[in-house]
A protein has these predicted regions:
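NAD(P)H dinucleotide-binding glycine-rich loop of Rossmann-like/cofactor-binding domains
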Residues: 61, 65, 70, 85, ...
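Glycine-rich phosphate-binding loop and adjacent beta-alpha segment
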Residues: 101, 220-285, 317-318
């Protein structure tokens, strides 16, 4: 099968198109013939940085060639002996073995059956692949950790990005009041997703406009930004961070406001995927795929992600 492999960290030129053997599945896995792959910022971090590669993939000491990627949608071609929920021919999607080694940049992927869900019939493989790591991050942050409920006021940063555009839609599906932040170019897009308000960070400080958010979802790197998110939360509210941990001054400021704080890392979960699939079937969330690349051009997808200006998601068609 064809795969995109990585032998050493570095630029996009380190991603090589290779021919390798199909993966063999165990009794609890299914073999997926991949139709679409989604690309995320974490993919580029793992490609660039040895520490990210070691920390997320957790490779064996003798492993020296890697297949990165986690987000797939495709068709079940083989099932393990213990698998009863899926059969050959089923269309499925999911985030595979994250954190860990998903090996998604390939024509075939071995996936634990408890990490995937049936693809909704009303969406394409490209839309499904997009709604995996990014949608799971939004779901787990808002639902699993923040326990979002109707009428919560939710402030979502980078609301037009991969995680953010799902977070807006998930929050609205719960009946929350949503305020998105981002650049002026993404304002109309985020409001069309259902956000009730939009703050253009290039023109005004969000913490000067909002100081009573019940939930703040912060996916922006840097302690300074997280301090401002803490200021935007109401006393007793919840702040979710994807990048910095709550330490030192951050912890002190959060404690003073009696905030619930969580630094989250998304993890593969088939039950959560089923909840996302349900919302997609109901038309409550949609994937915005801004660009598609052919498999051979996957390195160019990394290049686009690294601009930091992607609207919604980038997908590779296999």
């Amino acid at each position: 099968m064809k795969a995109i492999t990585l032998k050493e960290n570095g630029g996009i030129e380190k991603l090589k198109l290779s021919d390798i053997d199909k993966p063999k599945i165990n009794d609890d896995e299914v073999l997926i013939k991949v139709k679409a792959i989604s690309i995320n910022p974490v993919d580029t971090f793992v490609r660039q940085n040895k520490s990210s590669l070691q920390g997320i993939l957790k490779p064996g000491k003798d492993e020296n060639t890697f297949i990165i990627g986690w987000d797939v949608s495709g068709i079940v071609e083989e099932t393990g002996g213990n698998v009863t929920e899926f059969k050959n021919g089923d269309e499925v999607f999911g985030m595979i073995n994250f954190p860990g080694n998903g090996k998604a940049y390939a024509e075939y992927v071995a996936a634990p059956a408890d990490q995937i869900a049936l693809k909704p019939k009303n969406i394409s493989h490209e839309e499904a692949a997009a709604a995996t790591l990014a949608a799971l991050t939004a779901w787990q942050g808002l639902v699993t950790y923040a326990k979002i409920k109707k009428d919560d006021k939710v402030l979502i940063h980078a609301a037009g990005g991969g995680v953010g555009h799902y977070a807006v839609q998930i929050a609205k599906s719960f009946g929350a009041y949503v305020i998105g932040t981002g650049s002026s170019s993404k304002k109309d897009f985020v409001l069309k997703l259902g956000a009730d308000e939009y703050i253009d960070y290039t023109k005004e400080s969000f913490e000067k406009k909002v100081n009573d958010a019940g939930i703040v979802f912060d996916s922006i790197p840097g302690s300074e930004h997280l301090l401002r998110s803490i200021a935007a939360a109401k006393n007793g509210g919840t702040v979710i961070s994807i990048k910095p941990s709550f330490e030192g001054e951050l912890a002190d400021k959060a404690k003073a406001k009696e905030l619930q704080t969580y630094r989250i890392m998304v993890s593969s979960n088939g039950n959560d995927m089923k909840q996302i699939a349900k919302l997609m079937v109901e038309g409550k969330i949609h994937s915005h795929v801004s660009e598609k690349f052919n498999f051979e051009d996957l390195p160019k997808a990394h290049q686009q992600i690294e601009t930091g200006k992607t609207l919604g998601k980038i997908v590779v068609v296999v």
